[in-house]
């Protein structure tokens, strides 16, 4: 498994978000991606994906393809609750994706922005998607 914050618990199954991201990242239209675990009343947590498209790629049919790829490569328990195509992912100046911040906002917490954030405008643009 990887770091503790990269492991989510879906209905009693421990899943690596990194493994799910690896599947999403193999799609030819995906430039970069992130997967977070969001709270779910029934399963505890469910995986939710965010993808940035490569230049010239379209999102038509992409979500269905990504969900199917995760189900095929990892299994139904890892099936993504939702996949959002976004313009950019929030990162630190060193390039680390701010998954903890994304997870907190998605779960409805007032998550402070880390001082190391590269561009606070990215999280501001992503906030409506995270809370919906």
Task: Go through each PLM region and give its residues.
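AMP-binding/adenylate-forming catalytic core of the ANL superfamily
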Residues: 1-78, 97, 101-104, 109, ...
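A short, flexible beta-alpha/helix-coil linker loop
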Residues: 5-7, 88-91
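Short, acidic, Ser/Thr-enriched surface-loop or helix-capping motifs
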Residues: 41, 91-92
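General small-molecule cofactor/ligand-binding pocket signal
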Residues: 83-86
